């Protein structure tokens, strides 16, 4: 999760919502890809950290199925990202801070408990959540101060 937090800090420094992700091969715990939100730079609402990382991982291993991989995310995934995690069949999801507005794992939609979900990863929440929450709070304070 520390590496995902480093990615979130990179996003913060680029004025992107500070969400970071790493995907790890379960058998040796090696990070195969890391990413962060890139929505503003790419001018593309689909460029969430999870989507970028899943796309890169699938390309790297030449497979749409990531059964032997885990994903670490600094913020609870939204509905789009939760669906991508399910469709790519990631084994385990570890995330930091909950997202009371857009979170779709445990906060709101609970995508993985819905009938629309065909693969449910093992879910572990609250991993270094205080660091993720602090970074999000700092980011939105910074954004509000530039608007004023």
Curated annotation (Swiss-Prot):
Binding-site residues, Zn(2+): 48, 78, 81
EC number, as in UniProt: 3.5.4.33
CDD domains associated with the record: nucleoside_deaminase (cd01285)
Annotated active site: 50
GO biological process: tRNA wobble adenosine to inosine editing
Note on how the cofactor is bound: Binds 1 zinc ion per subunit.
Catalytic activity annotation: adenosine(34) in tRNA + H2O + H(+) = inosine(34) in tRNA + NH4(+)
Domain called CMP/dCMP-type deaminase: residue spans: 1-116
Keywords: Hydrolase, Metal-binding, tRNA processing, Zinc
GO MF term list: tRNA-specific adenosine-34 deaminase activity; zinc ion binding
Cofactor(s) named in the record: Zn(2+)
SUPFAM superfamilies per the UniProt record, alphabetical: Cytidine deaminase-like
Class of this enzyme: hydrolase
Similarity-based family: Belongs to the cytidine and deoxycytidylate deaminase family.
Chain's role: Catalyzes the deamination of adenosine to inosine at the wobble position 34 of tRNA(Arg2).
Record text on subunit structure and interactions: Homodimer.
Protein name per its UniProtKB record: tRNA-specific adenosine deaminase
Organism whose genome encodes this protein: Rickettsia typhi (strain ATCC VR-144 / Wilmington)
């Amino acid at each position: 999760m520390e590496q995902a937090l480093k990615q979130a800090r990179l996003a913060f420094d680029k004025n992107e919502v500070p969400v970071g992700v790493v995907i790890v091969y379960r058998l040796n715990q090696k990070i195969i890809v890391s990413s962060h939100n890139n929505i503003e730079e790419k001018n593309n609402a689909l460029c969430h950290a999870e989507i970028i990382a899943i796309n890169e991982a699938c390309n790297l291993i030449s497979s749409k199925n990531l059964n032997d991989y885990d994903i670490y995310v600094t913020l609870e995934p939204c509905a789009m990202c939760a669906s991508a995690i399910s469709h790519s069949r990631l084994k385990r999801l570890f995330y930091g801070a909950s997202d009371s507005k857009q979170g779709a794992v445990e906060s709101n939609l609970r995508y993985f408990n819905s009938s629309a979900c065909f693969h449910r990863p093992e879910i572990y929440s609250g991993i270094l959540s205080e660091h993720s929450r602090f970074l999000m709070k700092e980011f939105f304070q910074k954004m509000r101060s530039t608007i004023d």
